């Protein structure tokens, strides 16, 4: 095919040339479902292209490095007709099966990556974006806005996990809640509610609630403190404690009148350790140059070095690491 013919084909199908020249853009386009509010569609599509590059690079590096992909794909036996109680119970059961402990939110991201083969990426997202679920035939990915409060991040991660586990039976829309008609809107609303109940059960199972003990004299401060222990928001924990009969319903009324300051929590490192490890190996093996890796991650070379340090990953020798890493 000649260059003019190629350009004609690209123009006809409205496909950018980079789709064929950039090795990190997957030929099998990832499916995304975004959890967002008030984002400009064009900006969101541009950000999605960046996310597709990160995902594509992670996959291609894995193939070139001979790293096995998970042959198992986890699913959740729920449908949009399932009850909220069933969704909550499924979340709680998964917390036990994955051995997330008494603070599931603190362990969820690591367990999703280590035991479920799901890539988690903490990203600097556009304003209004909380997170996204993305799936390919051989990889599931959860993207989370790392600049959200910890409780929101963990809830979004659990919510996106639900979508990844139910993608075949309840495929989410590109935008959460996007519907073509009233009937579809009702169904999608139900699915989102099921996702929220699953997330609540996963992050706040009965065992974790019981481990909190009895409320202190200042219920508002006690709930706020225990929410920090679990890695959830005080409001979300308040609902669960009321359902469990541990605190009175008046708590929600009182807390809405008396706004509590958000707890300051540390910003999680960019991307994730598995992503950083694979990127470092790719640089060491000559699969990508340091400068190209900086462009891929949208970081300066110095910031990329700090990325490896933040995740406890040894820097490649070309970035000041030991020479032995290239062996």
Regions found by a protein language model. Name each.
Residues 1-327:
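Short juxta-domain linker segments that transition from a proline/glycine-rich
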């Amino acid at each position: 095919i000649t260059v003019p013919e190629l350009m004609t084909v690209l123009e006809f199908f409205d496909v950018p040339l980079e789709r064929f020249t950039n090795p990190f853009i997957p030929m099998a386009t990832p499916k995304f479902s975004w959890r967002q509010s008030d984002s400009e569609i064009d900006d969101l599509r541009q950000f999605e292209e960046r996310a597709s590059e990160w995902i594509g690079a992670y996959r291609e590096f894995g193939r070139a490095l001979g790293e096995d992909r998970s042959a198992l794909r986890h699913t959740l036996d729920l449908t949009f007709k399932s009850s909220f109680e069933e969704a909550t119970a499924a979340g709680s059961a998964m917390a036990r099966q994955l051995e997330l402990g008494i603070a599931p939110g603190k362990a969820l991201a690591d367990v999703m990556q280590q035991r479920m083969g799901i890539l988690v990426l903490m990203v600097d997202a556009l304003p209004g974006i909380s997170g996204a679920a993305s799936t390919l035939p051989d990889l599931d990915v959860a993207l989370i806005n790392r600049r959200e409060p910890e409780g929101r991040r963990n809830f979004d991660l659990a919510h996106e996990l639900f979508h990844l586990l139910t993608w075949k039976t309840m495929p989410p829309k590109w935008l959460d809640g996007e519907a073509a008609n009233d009937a579809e809107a009702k169904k999608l609303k139900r699915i989102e509610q099921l996702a929220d109940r699953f997330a609540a059960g996963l992050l706040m199972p009965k065992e974790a609630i019981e481990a909190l003990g009895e409320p202190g004299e200042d219920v508002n401060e006690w709930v706020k403190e225990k929410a920090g222990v679990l890695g959830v928001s005080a409001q979300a924990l308040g609902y669960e404690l009321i359902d469990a009969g541990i605190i009175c319903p008046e708590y929600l009324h009182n807390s809405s009148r008396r706004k509590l300051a958000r707890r300051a929590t540390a910003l999680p490192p960019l991307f994730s350790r598995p992503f950083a490890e694979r990127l470092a190996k790719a640089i060491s093996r000559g699969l990508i140059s340091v400068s190209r890796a900086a462009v891929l991650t949208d970081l300066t070379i110095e910031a990329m070095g700090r990325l490896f340090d933040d995740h406890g990953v040894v820097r490649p020798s070309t970035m000041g690491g030991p020479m032995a890493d290239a062996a």
